[in-house]
Amino acid sequence: FLPIIAKVLSGLL
């Protein structure tokens, strides 16, 4: 996954 996607997923979690 891209860094941006990872950050978004982390934010949701």
From Swiss-Prot:
Localization of this protein: Secreted
Recite the UniProt keywords alphabetically: Amidation, Amphibian defense peptide, Antibiotic, Antimicrobial, Secreted
Q: Which residues carry this modification: Leucine amide?
A: L13
Predominantly, its location class is: secreted
Q: Name the GO terms of the biological process aspect.
A: defense response to bacterium
- Record bears the keyword Secreted: yes
Q: In which tissues is it expressed?
A: Expressed by the skin glands.
Task: Give yes or no: UniProt keyword Transferase.
Answer: no
GO CC: one term? extracellular region
Q: Which family does it belong to?
A: Belongs to the frog skin active peptide (FSAP) family. Temporin subfamily.
* Purpose of the protein: Antibacterial activity against Gram-positive bacterium S.aureus.
Q: What is this protein called?
A: Temporin-1BYa
Q: Which organism is it from?
A: Rana boylii
